[in-house]
Amino acid sequence: SIKKRYPGQAKKVMMGLWGMGQLALTKIIIVVDHDVNVHDMNEVIWAITTRTDAARDTTIINNTPTDTLDPASPKVNLGSKLGIDATQKTLEEGFEREIQEQVKVDDDTKTTVDSKWPSYGL
């Protein structure tokens, strides 16, 4: 995660990581804002689905070194990488919409819903 300070910083982070030793073999990098818990996959997926536009925020690099053991690569040691910028976009990045704040559910509500979950019939 990053505390974004300027447009394009997420892509700069991706490129920097891919340029560092063994991290060059990383197949997919997802960059999120500092408000996203990178250890909680639900939060990462939330960031991707609410802050990413596929055309604007994905980077694909073709014909680049990959892990020898990557079974998806078309050739041994040569394949593609995917970068996803799942950070909140700014006006400077061409984002003209109102930024939506993340709604956090309080612990009491979570406990209530969890205790009643079986009765919902879902």
Residue spans for each PLM region:
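Charged, compositionally biased interaction regions
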Residues: 1-122
